[in-house]
From Swiss-Prot:
Disruption phenotype: When this gene is missing the Wadjet system does not confer plasmid-transformation resistance in B.subtilis.
UniProt superkingdom: Bacteria
Protein name: Wadjet protein JetB
One Pfam short name: DUF4194
Record's function text: Component of antiplasmid transformation system Wadjet type I, composed of JetA, JetB, JetC and JetD. Expression of Wadjet type I in B.subtilis (strain BEST7003) reduces the transformation efficiency of plasmid pHCMC05.
Amino acid sequence: MQNVSEREREEMGIVVNYLFSHNFLLKEFEREKYHLAVRNKDIIKQYLQVIGWDFIVDEKHGCIVIVSPHYEHRLKLKKDETIWLLVLRLIYEEKRSALSISQYPFTTLQEIKGKYETFRLPFVSKTKLRELVQIGKQNQLLRPIDNDIESDDCRFQLFHSCIHVLQQGDLNVLYEKIKSYSEGGDHSEMDEETTIN
């Protein structure tokens, strides 16, 4: 830390506090903070290791994540919230293989509903849909492109942070997890890999 200027220390403090409150730092939203964190990744990593946290810099996808040792900071989700995130992650995985790394996958509400139908899961109420979209926005997982989120044509941009929310990247694992809910799996919260703050 001796070679770091006072100004950079202050800026790194802002970055670390941002990560503690948001869990993700996306280049898409916070370009300046992102570049500062990448430039000083070794120092930030050492600092966070002292308190047992992992500092993951995913430059390929423009995403930085912090993870506590036992995932204590995760948000405990209800079953319908878990299903929603699993479906988004599944769509993300299916679409991203056809895109370049710098591009974000898009989906529509109709496509999301279609996944629910595929797994014979009832879709959520309009009120719950608004809550789920808000959770996605707050946690930098998605962004609605259109104003009417209840319209089947409403488009959503899915961010690369989806990779780090649910660690099961394998499509078969995602299918099986969603299928377990359609068969009456009674999980009240997400698995230990979940790192939504």
